[in-house]
A protein has these predicted regions:
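Core AdoMet radical
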Residues: 7-39, 49-66, 78-100, 108-141, ...
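Cysteine-centered iron-sulfur cluster-binding motifs in ferredoxin-type domains/subunits
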Residues: 1-2, 61
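Catalytic cores of alpha/beta
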Residues: 163-179
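Hydrophobic positions in alpha-helices of CheY-like receiver
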Residues: 75, 105, 143-150, 176
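Alpha-helical packing segments of well-folded alpha/beta enzyme cores
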Residues: 41-44, 71, 139-142, 146, ...
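Short, well-ordered alpha-helices that flank and scaffold nucleotide-derived cofactor binding pockets
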Residues: 8, 73, 77, 178
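C-terminal accessory regions of radical SAM enzymes
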Residues: 178-215
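Distinct, well-ordered alpha-helical segments
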Residues: 69-73, 99-106, 168-172
């Protein structure tokens, strides 16, 4: 998907727009996959998987990366999820829980200590605007399925605060708590710094003061 607060260095969907607009951080080509089709690259990790204690998955989007599924399925084969103190952390846009023949929730059932951080900046139509490609109804369906099937896993929202949503963050937080999407403690914020034209600091003074008043 194309989130409005990132760019082609973090999302392949941004590449064509970045080339057309002459964005100054555009890679020479789309960043799609490390050594695509080269399974020998992933097999280098096999001897070390039995000793892994912590994994942090981020992206891009880890749930549509072949490398993610290769390693996680190997860990299941080794029995690491149930019999060891392995801790697993995700940052995901939480838009799609299936990939090819894989199902994330079925995978996660094999692990005891797993934390899912959903990168969500708003709800409804605004969520679909900020992270183009989002279908909010599907995000809700994914959350209810997760709560029903593996309620013991940690789930939290990681919200990027920018000029687009700084005046709505508090309402978004309350809404997510009110509908049971998260517990009150499960909400974190990232202040957008990398894309200066979209920082909250570009807003007029009266809007910045209103944001401060709300917080």
């Amino acid at each position: 998907m194309r989130c409005r607060t990132c760019g082609p260095d973090l999302s392949s969907q941004w590449f064509e727009d970045a080339v057309e607009s002459k964005y100054n951080r555009t890679p020479e080509q789309k960043i799609l996959q490390i050594r695509k089709g080269n399974t020998a690259f992933m097999e280098q990790f096999d001897p070390y998987l039995d000793t892994v204690e912590k994994i942090y998955w981020a992206g891009g989007e880890p749930l549509i990366m072949d490398e993610h599924w290769y390693i996680m399925n190997k860990l299941v084969e080794l029995g690491k999820g149930r019999t060891s103190p392995l801790r697993i952390f995700y940052n995901t846009n939480f838009s799609k829980l299936t990939y090819k023949e894989h199902d994330a929730i079925e995978l996660w059932k094999n692990f005891n200590d797993l934390s899912i951080g959903a990168s969500l900046d708003a709800s409804g139509k605004k969520a679909e605007y900020l992270r183009k490609g989002t279908k909010w109804s599907e995000t809700l369906e994914n959350r209810w399925r997760l709560k029903n099937e593996i309620p013991h896993h940690d789930f939290n929202i990681s919200c990027t605060v920018s000029m687009f949503n700084v005046l709505d963050v508090c309402n978004f937080y309350r809404e997510m708590c009110d509908i049971g999407f998260i517990e009150p403690k499960d909400f974190g914020v990232n202040i957008l710094l990398g894309k200066h034209i979209h920082r909250a600091t570009v807003l007029p003074k009266h809007m910045r003061e209103e944001a401060q008043r709300q917080i």
